[in-house]
Amino acid sequence: AELNRRTDEFGGSLDNRARPLFAIIEGIRRECGNDFHVGVRLSPERFGMKIDEIREVYSRLVATGQIDMIDMSLWDCAKNAIEEGWADRRLIDIFAGIDRGTVRLAVAGKLYSAAAVREVLGAGADIAVVGRAAITNHDFPRMMRDNPDFAMRELPVPAQTLRDEGLSDTFVGYMRNWKGFVAD
């Protein structure tokens, strides 16, 4: 809404702005069939999107019967929404509470410990998507399974530690762009 200033069939109303997304999904299904799993990532509270709009797109995606998973990039699964009218609810609760039938819900956002992963799964997510935790600990899922109190390494992490975790020099270089991620 805020960022899309188009005046053609892809701008203005939510229907128009969502049109490319639904056309792409329809094309993927047509070309790949039902045995091909399709997931869609949605990012509330980013890029001018409002929670009500994201919830509407989410519900429409489920209603199409053409997707298998919705991946909500929440940036911080534990925080309350910042948008007026939603600020008394956690983002995870806002989206886990939507009827999704057989569509799986994946969530990402500061899942740095086994406790945080348990929390989002307990709140209704089907899949916990870990990013930084898996970068700093390549075996994060196994470590969580073996130790219910496991948490990722403290940041910043020495570059050599990242290399020891399997990151290439190119990837370590990329991670240096993330403020406070690489120590040296």
Feature map (PLM): residue ranges:
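Flavin-dependent oxidoreductase catalytic cores
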Residues: 1-184
